[in-house]
């Protein structure tokens, strides 16, 4: 599945790697959606800077695979973000993908978790964008792709911080799209539904136990209840959209929030 979808993500219109000579920084890219996007961009010739945590040997292997470099910057720390950009140099493509989730009734929501989600899911998007834009302006070209969520368009109970941050990412993206449009820079969101990642896969056994349901019931009646296709989105499908948004042919695709959710937000 991954290889087939990656072919779609990197299919060339002109037989050339259209991102040759471009540098891309993808946050939260050592696994899941971010890694799929990094692979898609690297396959089109981009020099990729990975960001995220994980096993050192696995990250080194990914860097070898993609010809990439890696920053382990903690994106909840503005100083660490500034240092990451100082080390990376000017960026042509910024993918703000890093994020986290916490589920709790609002009256029980730990304040420190609220602050942590806002710092990573929203403030880091601002700090990374602020650092990347001057170089993009100097070159007269740039692409900013922000991973939002179906929860940037609709809400779900017990996800107050996540819903708030993803709605914020949507509004921020539209604002900077207007600010930067005359500089050859576009900014767009991608809003996935439930994506089949190791994180989601690992949560299924706990949900089976907590709700006393079968694995199939958890997948179909809980996780996929809102996705009319009854299929998980694959990371490579999100990557395909991100790669397209970096093409010159997408220069007038700006300020949009693209759903990749099996029809969830069409209701």
Go through the PLM ranges and name each one.
Residues 23, 30-31:
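Conserved glycine-rich cofactor-binding loop
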Residues 134, 178-179, 251:
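Alpha-helical segment proximal to the catalytic Tyr-Lys
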Residues 129, 165, 173:
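Active-site helix of classical SDR
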Residues 4-15, 154, 242-243, 254-267:
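Short C-terminal tail/terminal secondary-structure segment
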Residues 149:
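Residue(s) in the substrate-gating loop at a strand-loop-helix junction
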Residues 181, 186, 253-255:
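Short, small/polar-rich loop/turn modules that mediate ligand/substrate recognition or access, typified
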Residues 105-106, 110-118, 144, 223:
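Substrate-binding pocket helix/loop in short-chain dehydrogenase/reductase
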């Amino acid at each position: 599945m991954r290889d087939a979808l990656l072919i779609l993500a990197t299919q060339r219109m002109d037989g050339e790697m259209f991102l040759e000579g471009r540098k891309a920084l993808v946050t939260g890219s050592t696994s899941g959606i971010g890694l799929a996007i990094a692979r898609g961009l690297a396959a089109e010739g981009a020099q990729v800077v990975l960001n995220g945590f994980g096993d050192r040997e696995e990250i080194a292997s990914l860097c070898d695979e993609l010809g990439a470099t890696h920053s382990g910057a903690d994106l909840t720390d503005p100083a660490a973000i500034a240092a990451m950009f100082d080390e990376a140099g000017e960026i042509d493509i910024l993918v703000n993908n890093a994020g986290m989730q916490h589920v709790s009734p609002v009256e029980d929501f730990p304040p420190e978790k609220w602050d942590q989600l806002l710092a990573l899911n929203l403030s880091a998007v601002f700090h990374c964008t602020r650092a990347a834009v001057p170089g993009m302006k100097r070159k007269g070209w740039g692409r900013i792709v922000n991973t939002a969520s179906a929860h940037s368009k609709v809400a779900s109970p017990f996800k107050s911080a996540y819903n708030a941050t993803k709605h914020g990412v949507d509004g921020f993206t539209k604002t900077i799209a207007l600010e930067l449009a005359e500089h050859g820079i576009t900014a767009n969101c991608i809003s996935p539904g439930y994506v089949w990642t190791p994180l989601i896969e690992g949560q299924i056994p706990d949900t089976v136990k907590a709700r006393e349901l079968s694995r199939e019931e958890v997948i179909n009646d809980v996780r996929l209840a809102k996705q009319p296709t009854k299929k998980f989105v694959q990371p490579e499908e999100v990557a395909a959209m991100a790669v397209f948004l970096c093409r010159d042919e997408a220069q007038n695709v700006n300020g949009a929030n693209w759903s990749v959710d099996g029809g969830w937000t069409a209701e």
